[in-house]
């Protein structure tokens, strides 16, 4: 399946058909930059999916954070179920970079925790780009960081066809050079096991399928994909390509060449340090570098091998490092979502990384060539970026300067118009807000309140709670998963009011929110800029009765521009609806649908039993009222749990065990 096939029950509507036509036209005309100025809820992702389906080009979609990347990944998987939709974000759950603090003589060693599932998805993403013309990669700004050189990476692949002649020992040696390890007991990703002439290999980029290679007299007699848990053969294969375990795997001859170059640089640097009477730094550098070289010669890699990436990729000093962009085919397309946030991120990465590494080089912890293990500079990123579409409700100055064409998508397919805006005095903002909340809660609608400081958000939450308002507070200390759960609870009606400081960054759909209250809207600054105000006001744009109240004593320039722009959009939307006889309809979205991709996409790595368990838990609160109902439910779940255990689905069985325990606790309290 080499062509993009868009699968959707919806047809483009509102401003979408014209926006899609203009974007496709611009791409075919060779425009290097275009901007899709799409209001909240106008279906920007659907428009981009239609563009991809029409131009039939591999696409990199850049998102500003993992939460939005995961949401986009889920949406594109739905739109393109028959194509290769991949996810490329930082694979660190925790990352403490190597650093040195001269003032206290403190060396901080690199410490990290790698998420195995995301590492597998990164490898799957590069494999898709190298093998398939129908790849869509959803990535974050981590895509501008150094990655192994694609030419070296491709040299290392192991390609097997049925009927190939290969000695068993040679096959095992090739697998070892890909950094696969032999493990006959624990069969996991990037391992292989040997049973006579049958070799089972678990590809590094796979999550559910392993490959069985059957040899007969040094000939590949059979290749088959099988389930590593049950051993069931899924299908026979005519051929298969095994990719390395890491993007940094390098051919042996390149390694030997690199070691010689590193030794030459080490000698030069040691002479410099000793001539400048930096004896401690010289001894430190020599000891660390020689240890790394020994590891590279013996194992093919070492901890921190990325610091020698200039030599491993054969690049000249100062040349940009190889990144995900080097893996993109020549005819690729780049889509930058929420570009007003994503583009400035790209520019900021290089500077912070550089200052930390310069200190390490100066004090003898790294060779000067380590400075070339870095993210791309902004101008380098511009040079390697293919044709680009910026997507934002509030494009920034960079987009305004570079966009060859600005395409507006203001009219929503649902006919919904932008929220009404009202300015009210800040003097009585809290009391007025309380009365507004009571009106909305009476209609079973939700409210977002944004404040300027953490202290005020906490105080307001306490005040509203004291007045019997069901309220929660969203702040920066809450991690991504919990943040998603809070938004789920708001939509589900577990509480009615969400107070925060920078709520616009969520980018998640909340159709139940009918009122956005912005306190101290006249305090100019980052949180009350024109762009921030428009984004925050947009949170109420998915509700039929959407309204935004700006509490302010003066109307600032930013406020006036935000109000004027929103009114301009409202006028255009209302005129379109009247001209076409459209009656606005409220958005109704399944809560689980919106959040499907909002946590790191791991669902595809689960088997059926696990997925079924999660569906049940949300029903308890509403359905199970009496002790007899709860007891009946416990018996049903116990039967399922024992069946899953018999089927060796222990992860799913454990989840059911936890559900049963929760129900038993409820039974005691009923």
From Swiss-Prot:
Protein name: UvrABC system protein B
UniProt organism field: Pseudomonas aeruginosa (strain ATCC 15692 / DSM 22644 / CIP 104116 / JCM 14847 / LMG 12228 / 1C / PRS 101 / PAO1)
GO CC terms: cytoplasm; excinuclease repair complex
Residues annotated as binding ATP: 38-45
GO molecular function, one term: excinuclease ABC activity
Family per similarity comment: Belongs to the UvrB family.
Free-text comment on this protein's domains from its UniProt entry: The beta-hairpin motif is involved in DNA binding.
Main location class: cytoplasm
Residue ranges of domain Helicase C-terminal in the record: 429-582
Function: The UvrABC repair system catalyzes the recognition and processing of DNA lesions. A damage recognition complex composed of 2 UvrA and 2 UvrB subunits scans DNA for abnormalities. Upon binding of the UvrA(2)B(2) complex to a putative damaged site, the DNA wraps around one UvrB monomer. DNA wrap is dependent on ATP binding by UvrB and probably causes local melting of the DNA helix, facilitating insertion of UvrB beta-hairpin between the DNA strands. Then UvrB probes one DNA strand for the presence of a lesion.
This protein's record includes keyword Chaperone: no
Domain Helicase ATP-binding: 25-412
Subunit note: Forms a heterotetramer with UvrA during the search for lesions. Interacts with UvrC in an incision complex.
């Amino acid at each position: 399946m080499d062509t993009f096939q868009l699968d959707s029950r919806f047809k483009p509507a509102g401003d979408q058909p014209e926006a899609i036509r203009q974007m496709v036209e611009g791409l075919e005309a060779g425009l290097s930059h275009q901007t899709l100025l799409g209001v909240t809820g106008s279906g920007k992702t659907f428009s981009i999916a239609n563009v991809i389906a029409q131009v039939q080009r591999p696409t990199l979609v850049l998102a500003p954070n993992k939460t939005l990347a995961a949401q986009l990944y889920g949406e594109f998987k739905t739109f393109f179920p028959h194509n290769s939709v991949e996810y490329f974000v930082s694979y660190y759950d925790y990352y403490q970079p190597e650093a040195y603090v001269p003032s206290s003589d403190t060396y901080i060693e690199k410490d990290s925790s790698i998420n195995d599932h995301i590492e597998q998805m990164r490898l799957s993403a590069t494999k898709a780009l190298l093998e398939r013309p129908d790849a869509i990669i959803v990535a974050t700004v981590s895509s501008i960081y150094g990655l192994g050189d694609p030419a070296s990476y491709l040299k290392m692949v192991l390609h097997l066809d049925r009927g190939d002649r290969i000695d068993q020992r040679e096959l095992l040696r090739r697998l070892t050079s890909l950094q696969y390890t032999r493990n006959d007991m624990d069969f996991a990703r990037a391992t292989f096991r040997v049973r006579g002439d049958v070799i089972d290999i678990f590809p590094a980029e796979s999550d559910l399928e392993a490959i069985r290679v059957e040899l007969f007299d040094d000939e590949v007699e059979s290749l088959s994909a099988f389930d590593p848990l049950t051993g069931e053969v899924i299908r026979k294969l005519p051929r298969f390509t095994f990719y390395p375990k890491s993007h940094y795997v390098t051919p042996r001859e390149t390694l030997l060449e690199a070691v010689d170059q590193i030794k030459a640089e080490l000698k030069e640097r040691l002479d410099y340090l000793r001539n400048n009477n930096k004896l401690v730094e010289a001894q430190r550098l020599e000891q660390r570098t020689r240890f790394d070289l020994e590891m590279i010669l013996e194992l093919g890699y070492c901890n921190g091998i990325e610091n020698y990436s200039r030599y491993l990729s054969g690049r000249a000093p100062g040349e940009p490092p190889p990144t995900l962009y080097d893996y993109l085919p020549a005819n690729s397309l780049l889509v930058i979502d929420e570009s007003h946030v994503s583009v400035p991120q790209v520019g900021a990465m290089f500077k912070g990384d550089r200052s930390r590494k310069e200190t390490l080089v100066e004090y003898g912890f790294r060779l000067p060539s380590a400075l070339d293990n870095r993210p791309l500079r902004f101008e380098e990123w511009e040079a390697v970026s293919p044709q680009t579409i910026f997507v934002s409700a509030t494009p920034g100055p960079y987009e305004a300067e570079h966009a060859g064409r600005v395409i507006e998508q203001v009219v929503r397919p649902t006919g919904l118009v932008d929220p009404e805006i009202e300015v009210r005095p800040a003097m009585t903002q809290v009391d007025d807000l309380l009365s507004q909340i009571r009106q909305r809660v009476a209609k079973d609608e939700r409210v977002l309140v944004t404040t300027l400081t953490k202290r005020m958000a906490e105080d307001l939450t306490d005040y509203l709670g004291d007045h019997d308002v069901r309220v929660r507070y969203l702040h920066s200390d809450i991690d991504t998963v919990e943040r998603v759960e809070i938004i789920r609870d708001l939509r589900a009606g577990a509480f009615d009011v969400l107070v925060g400081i920078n709520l616009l960054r969520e980018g998640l759909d909340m159709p139940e929110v009918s009122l956005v209250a912005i306190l101290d809207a006249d305090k100019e600054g980052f949180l009350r800029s024109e762009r921030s105000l428009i984004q925050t006001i947009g949170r109420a744009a998915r509700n039929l009765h959407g309204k935004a109240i700006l509490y302010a004593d003066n109307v600032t320039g930013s406020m006036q521009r935000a109000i004027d722009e929103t009114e301009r959009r409202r006028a255009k939307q209302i005129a379109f609806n009247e001209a076409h006889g459209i009656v606005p309809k409220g958005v109704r979205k399944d809560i689980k649908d919106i959040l499907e991709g909002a946590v790191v996409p791991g669902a595809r790595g689960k088997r059926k039993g696990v997925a079924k368990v999660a569906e049940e838990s949300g029903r308890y609160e509403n359905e199970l009222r009496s002790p007899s109902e709860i007891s009946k439910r416990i018996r049903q779940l116990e039967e399922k749990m024992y069946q899953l255990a018999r089927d060796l689905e222990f992860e799913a069985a454990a989840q059911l065990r936890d559900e049963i325990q929760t129900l038993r606790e409820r039974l005691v309290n009923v």
